[in-house]
Amino acid sequence: MNDGIMFYANLPSRLLEYIHDETSDSLYYRELADQAPDQRARDLFMEFSRDEAQHAANFKEVYYRLTGMQPMVPPVEPPQIPPYCEAIKARIMAESGDLVKYGEESVSAPDQMLRDLFYITSLIEGRHGLRLTTLMCGVDDEKHRC
């Protein structure tokens, strides 16, 4: 079986996982915004939440195009948010992992539309990780200091 056929054979199940993960990440950032120490951090988390929701929507659209069915994704549990600094550090690691995961999908994708989708998604995830690092310095109150 050639690589393109294998890519497509496994893609629907990967997309279901990605839809679930991106939806979960969107909810996580929305909840994290409630812990934000200032408006700048709150705005950043809400921007990330919207980005992650858009990633899920993009993957749902691809799933539908491939299968002709709406994706059946298990319900997303409400996120358990650790203390602020731990949450930031965990998200930096998660976002950098997503950067790599979607970058690998981009390189493996047999058609341009999927390559572009995964590439752009990987860039946005990488941007999230980098921007999260800016929240680790300059926090004045003890509760949010990293």
What would you call each of these model-derived segments?
Residues M1-C146:
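Non-heme di-metal
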